[in-house]
């Protein structure tokens, strides 16, 4: 096998014949993954049964949006459908600062180069260190709060969508459950500032609670955001960067990079 791997690495011409019992025929575009599969009489499903690419995120909110992003990509890009199952979103919350520290630590390079770090959109991608930032250029909750405010102020057709209407997500729902609470929170921040009290971390905590208390509603908001042409560049940027990292990480898990072409 090592000789085959060496030949493929050097891009030497290699003819591999598939034994089909009654006949033999050449394998098209032979690579080490296909050859191993046939030598061991395995199917593609067998080979990838226990193989995953770990995705580390900051929190549950990021994983929620990542699930919706993956669902969107599967419906939009046929080639993504076959690889989405290979990504494993690790159920652990790690701050952006700590994640960045781990993935940029040269001593841990051998470990981190086998995983992908997904930071919130208020950070920047660092492909060299296997870090990609979510689309939106802000934390997930902030992206959605800003977007729903925009839909409200512009009287967007979103509010007349039959699914939204049937779910009871009217403008009154937004005003009562989100807009008024945001207004009260902003007033509280002003009070803290006047009294010289710290407001550190309060906005993020407030946004997270608001998101989780209205998660079903914000799911529809994000789906609308995904289909808004204004956001296409950001959505495509994340897709392309994730693709680049997949190509870099896949071989470490014996996953054929050609699965996503």
Task: Walk through the language-model features, giving the residues of each.
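Residue-level signal for secondary-structure boundary elements
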Residues: 78, 152, 156-160, 234, ...
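RecA-like P-loop NTPase motor core
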Residues: 9-125
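C-terminal, charge/polar-rich interaction regions
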Residues: 167-261
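Generic alpha-helical structural element
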Residues: 54-58, 88, 92, 133, ...
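Sensor-1/coupling segment of RecA-like P-loop NTPase cores
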Residues: 1-8
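Short phosphate-engaging motifs
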Residues: 3, 61-65, 140
